[in-house]
Amino acid sequence: MRISVGVLFLVAASCAAQTRPAIIGVSHIAVYTSDAAQTEHFYVHDIGLKKGEDPENSNGVRYYVNQEQFVEVLPLPADAGTNRLDHLAYMTKSAEQMRQYLSAKGVAVPATVEHASDGSAWFEVKDPEGNKVQFVQPPARLLGMKGTAGLYALSGADPIGRRIIHVGMLVHNQATEDAFYRGILGFRPYWHGGMKEDKTDWVSQQVPDGHDWLEYMLTSGPSGSGIPAQISRQQLGVLNHFSLGVVNMEKAVTTLYEEDRLGETPPRPQIGRDGKWQFNDYDPDGTRVEVMEFTPAAKPCCSEFTAANPTPEAQP
């Protein structure tokens, strides 16, 4: 029996569409600013990130944590209201394969991936609650973080934490979001807990092929989508956040203090409900930056960790 080359190609393409490419970590968080100068001071001076151009959006600016991860800052839209989060993004080995995979799973995807001027490829979808999610295939070569001539002309102090270890966002319904993040994308349970033992406020799941995680910040507001009317910009900034990993909290805070990078109201480090040392700072528009140790210093409340913790050795 003869099988045409065309048939074999279609079969291979179909199989590829059913295979999820690796999702290896958090790529970035994109937030809005109402004051670009103040925001630059915060991310460059206080947090120590590296400013660079935004190859994806000429109106934006990137503040790099390392060569692959960054905070994307965009101008505040007129209709933003209390929202300061534009999207969250995850790194994948193949943006095109991921686009095909999600399409095969019934997720609405764009017709093609976008190609940025830095050599990265990306596309954007919406999760079941309407949050924008990007999948980014990093450039094949990344230069510039240590002053080497490369893709970006970067300046600024070294970041206080050299990896984004998690991102968090407001979530109304865990089961609805789980169908996408755990069911389709393969995110793995990591930890869950709350301010009280009998109530879950936070649900964390790691990317399937790494140790960075997404934290659901569960709201007690009405189930559905969008931002509940009773949530202020400040409260929303606490929920929609990102976290930088550090090895030693005492050393990190001491560095910030000695270099006058703590602002007028210095944050107080504390052991969180997950047993990890952490402290919170906020950008000028209220987006929370959570500095957190990689591993717990005490027993977590509510549940045990069900996956390996991130490590500093995993940093790019």
Predicted segments — roles?
Residues 8-17:
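Hydrophobic h-region of N-terminal signal peptides that target proteins for export
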Residues 41, 50-51, 69-72, 80-82, ...:
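Short loop/beta submotifs within extracellular cysteine-rich repeat domains
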Residues 18-21, 24-34, 61-63, 77-163, 168-169, 191-197, ...:
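Vicinal oxygen chelate
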Residues 214-234:
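Flexible internal linker/loop segments at domain or repeat junctions
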Residues 21, 30-70, 116-126, 168-221, ...:
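Core segments of cupin and vicinal oxygen chelate
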Residues 34, 44-48, 94, 103-107, ...:
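Sec-exported extracytoplasmic/periplasmic mature domains
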